[in-house]
Swiss-Prot record:
Major role in the synthesis of nucleoside triphosphates other than ATP. The ATP gamma phosphate is transferred to the NDP beta phosphate via a ping-pong mechanism, using a phosphorylated active-site intermediate. The lineage of its organism: Eukaryota, Metazoa, Ecdysozoa, Nematoda, Chromadorea. SMART domains: NDK. Gene3D superfamilies: Nucleoside diphosphate kinase-like domain. Belongs to the NDK family. It is found in: Cytoplasm. Keywords: ATP-binding, Cytoplasm, Kinase, Magnesium, Metal-binding, Nucleotide metabolism, Nucleotide-binding, Phosphoprotein, Transferase. The gene is NDK. It comes from Brugia malayi (Filarial nematode worm). The active site is at residue 119. Its EC number is 2.7.4.6. This is Nucleoside diphosphate kinase.
Length: 153
């Protein structure tokens, strides 16, 4: 079983930033009871994104994805909590928003795969790799949430 210190990487994509959805996406994680340990807004470089999406190199959509992700600001975040990698993926919904259930972030706010508003780590090893790629260790804030006793037994 996962522990309450498990971490995942979530990135709000340029389309969601432009559409003013940052707060709505952020709120889903807070309301669920997850703890934010890092967040920053930046315009990612193509080279940074090529490393982030390295497992997709060679796919026909790779260059379009990198171009889109570098077209505007993104919000990079690290969330912490019990089973957060798996639960965050369920909260996001399917990569193709048309296959996402209503109530999921993508099911509620997006229509096309190429503009699916948010990225989330797909496994614990991916989360660890993505967190270290986007954040320096000193950017991760260790803190105790006053609400933790109301979220966890």
């Amino acid at each position: 079983m996962s522990n309450t210190k498990e971490r995942t990487f979530i990135c709000i994509k340029p389309d969601a930033v432009q559409r003013g959805l940052i707060g709505k996406i952020f709120e889903r994680f807070e309301q669920r009871g997850y703890k934010l340990v890092a967040m920053k807004m930046l315009k990612a470089t193509k080279s940074h994104l090529e490393i982030h999406y390295q497992e997709l190199q060679g796919k026909p959509f790779f260059n379009d994805l990198v171009g889109y992700m570098s077209s505007g600001p993104v919000i990079a975040m690290v969330w912490e909590g019990l089973d957060v990698v798996k639960q965050a993926r369920q909260m996001l919904g399917a990569t193709n928003p048309l296959n996402s259930m209503p109530g999921t972030i993508r099911g509620d706010f997006s229509i096309q795969t190429g503009r699916n508003i948010v990225h989330g780590s797909d496994s614990l090893p991916s989360a660890e790799r993505e967190i270290t790629h986007w954040f320096k260790p000193e950017e991760l804030c260790e803190w105790s949430s006053a609400t933790a006793t109301w979220v966890y037994e």
